Curated annotation (Swiss-Prot):
Homotetramer. It catalyses: 5-O-(1-carboxyvinyl)-3-phosphoshikimate = chorismate + phosphate. It comes from the Bacteria. InterPro entries: Chorismate_synth, Chorismate_synth_AroC_sf, Chorismate_synthase_CS. Belongs to the chorismate synthase family. This is Chorismate synthase. Reduced FMN (FMNH(2)). The keyword Transmembrane does not apply. HAMAP family: Chorismate_synth.
């Protein structure tokens, strides 16, 4: 299987399956001298891990990270950083009914045709459990970006199924199981999700991700545009079916006089570009929206076929998220961080000595 490595300078290679002994990643290209402990990484893993509320999968995993290499006396050495997360709560017997049948909406059918074999236990490597390794790597990237530039990356859920969530303040995001920036709607969301779960069905979600204090100049102007690589990173997350940068699809109904972000000596007057122009960061907040499809694993019987092409009816057993989007925020933050750190290091390699005389107006209002 190819395609398990992300990045050009700050590279992350993930490994492991949902019901294997464990999963993890190898980070190469991390600058030396970054203070790093397992606690720095564990914070984000705890935000992503399963079993944290009745609205997510009840699989119980501690997701305790182990740093195996690349850190000495509390600091990165510049050598590969190996991170390991052991699986402890696999229940593979729940998947016996899909050993020779394909679950609708899953990668079972495509994996079988591509590789001629598949690990059906919990979806194997196609499971969203793989994203724990990305979150671990992203935590390292986030810490370096914060120390180097003061970059802060925040993600929150803006819609669950038909329920739109009003923004009240980022301080609410960590106070509820929905990663919602609104505490007043939590009871409504809990009632809604209880109904979804009891109906043996699932729903999708929409998330907003922002990166503040990003330096001007990250990204390349043609194929490696910053917005293109952000979209690539987000689309690589399980269940993501759409990505918007800045105004996104709302740009269709805007006039050029509205959409183009005007500049003044005091700063930009708007941010419809989402912090990126010509594939290069402007220094404004980078703003991204992603759409998450409904969880494919549901207990409602559905039609499919087995490996011989015979019709079957499948009701997925096991422990699954009725809305996988509720645990996507730390994953999306991690992927944005991995894009930004890689481009920051690429920019430093080529353009470290470049200095423009024009003031950085993105900093004028900070």
């Amino acid at each position: 299987m190819a395609g398990n490595t992300f990045g050009q300078i700050f590279t992350v290679t993930t490994f492991g399956e949902s019901h294997g002994a464990g999963l993890g990643c190898i980070i190469d290209g991390c600058p030396p001298g970054l203070e790093l402990s397992e606690a720095d990484i564990q914070f984000d893993l705890d935000r992503r891990k399963p079993g944290t509320s009745r609205h997510v999968t009840q699989r119980r995993e501690a997701d305790q990270v182990e740093i195996l290499s690349g850190v000495f006396e509390g600091k990165t050495t510049g050598t590969p950083i190996a991170l390991l997360i052991r699986n402890t709560d696999q229940r593979s017997k729940d998947y016996g009914n899909i050993a020779t049948a394909f679950r609708p909406g899953h990668a079972d059918y495509t994996y079988w045709h591509k590789y001629g074999t598949r690990d059906y236990r919990g979806g194997g490597r196609s499971s969203a459990r793989e994203t724990a390794a990305r979150v671990a790597a992203g935590a390292v990237a986030k810490k370096w970006l914060k120390e180097k530039f003061g970059t802060e990356i925040t993600a929150y859920v803006t819609q669950v199924g038909e329920k739109k969530i009003r923004f009240e303040g980022s301080e609410h995001i960590s106070q509820n199981p929905f990663f919602a920036a609104n505490q007043s709607q939590i009871a409504e969301l809990e009632h809604y999700m209880d109904g979804v779960r009891k109906s043996l069905d699932s729903v999708g979600a929409k998330l907003h991700i922002e990166a503040a204090n990003v330096p001007v100049g990250l990204g390349e102007p043609v194929f490696d545009r910053l917005d293109a690589e952000i979209a690539y990173a987000m689309m690589g997350i399980n269940a993501v079916k759409g990505v918007e940068i800045g105004a996104g699809f709302d740009s269709v109904t805007q006039r050029g006089s509205e959409h183009g972000d005007e500049l003044t000596p005091q700063g930009f007057l708007s941010n419809h570009s989402g912090g990126i122009l010509g594939g290069i960061s402007t220094g404004q907040d980078i703003c991204v929206n992603i759409a998450i499809k409904p969880t494919s694993s549901i207990a409602t019987p559905r039609r499919s076929i087995d490996i011989h092409g015979n019709p079957v009816e499948l009701a997925t057993r096991g422990r699954h998220d009725p809305c996988v989007g509720l645990r996507t925020a730390p994953i999306a933050e991690a992927m944005l961080a991995l894009v930004l750190i890689d481009h920051a290091l690429r920019h430093r390699a080529q353009n470290a000595d470049v200095a423009a005389d024009t003031p950085d107006i993105s900093r004028s209002d900070k």
